[in-house]
Amino acid sequence: MSSNSIALAVIGGTGVYKLAQLDQVQTHEVDTPYGAPSGPIRVGMLLGHRVAFLARHGEGHSLPPHKVNYRANIAALQQIGATRVLALNTVGGITDSFGPRVLACPDQLIDYTWGRISTFCEEAGSEVQHVDFGHPYSPMFRSKVIAAAKVTGVTLVAGGCYGATQGPRLETIAEIARMRRDGCDLVGMTGMPEAALAREKGLEYACLAIVANWAAGCGDAQEITMAEVLSNVDAASSGLPELIGELARG
């Protein structure tokens, strides 16, 4: 790996709009054939390794989940040289092991979104790809995320099924009950089509889900407030710089 290569790219979700301890930061405005990404890509040094960061919802959280240009985000990260992408996704917990302030590295997902451009095989003349998506997150990269958590002492649930919903509204109790029956442990709004697009581009991709609240009808869930969400994300994210730094080592 050359000194100028990107060791790791991180996509930040709700409540994670910058990467703590990222030094010597350079800002890159990237154009792609699919339009502009959510915002500039910040590239800097984290614990001795070159790491890129992109805020999925834009700076100031200006983009709701269904308006994110997922294709441009993935293409932009690839264009700057990233080959490994760690996606930070703020989610709700459905099953008992996934309560607020839990970090999880899911191994499966179910897509409930609609109307989003979900492939790079869209324009006339583009190569048609039927990518294998049985394991939607890179198994080898997931194992490295889990190992990095152990090394840095970050408590992490290894596994779980992420259910991706359309948003931006939260789900009904009945919708969450259906998702539980389907086998979902977590619910979020940005897991797809991001994971599938990364697979089409040949990127190693894993999700680190930050549980901000109980989903509707689960746990001791009451009315969910944004203040509660951000507080729980902040608490659960305290060990992320060390985990990400360890992951960037290779």
From Swiss-Prot:
Gene3D superfamilies documented for this protein:
Nucleoside phosphorylase domain
Q: Which family does it belong to?
A: Belongs to the PNP/MTAP phosphorylase family. MTAP subfamily.
> Which PROSITE patterns does this one have?
PNP_MTAP_2 (PS01240)
GO MF term (any one): S-methyl-5-thioadenosine phosphorylase activity
**What is the organism lineage in this UniProt record?**
Bacteria, Pseudomonadati, Pseudomonadota, Gammaproteobacteria, Lysobacterales
Keyword terms of this UniProt record? Glycosyltransferase, Purine salvage, Transferase
Task: Give the GO terms filed under biological process for this record.
Answer: L-methionine salvage from methylthioadenosine; purine ribonucleoside salvage
**Residues binding substrate:** M189, N213, W214, A215
UniProt xrefs under InterPro entries: MTAP, Nucleoside_phosphorylase_d, Nucleoside_phosphorylase_sf, Purine_phosphorylase-2_CS
Q: Where does phosphate bind?
A: T14, R56, H57, T190
Q: Where is this site: Important for substrate specificity?
A: E171, M226
List the GO cellular component terms: cytosol
| The protein's name | Probable S-methyl-5'-thioinosine phosphorylase
Q: Give the species this sequence originates from.
A: Xanthomonas campestris pv. campestris (strain ATCC 33913 / DSM 3586 / NCPPB 528 / LMG 568 / P 25)
Miscellaneous note, as given in the UniProt record, is: Although this enzyme belongs to the family of MTA phosphorylases based on sequence homology, it has been shown that conserved amino acid substitutions in the substrate binding pocket convert the substrate specificity of this enzyme from 6-aminopurines to 6-oxopurines.
EC number(s) per entry: 2.4.2.44
Q: How does it assemble?
A: Homotrimer.
Q: Which top class of enzyme applies to this chain? A: transferase
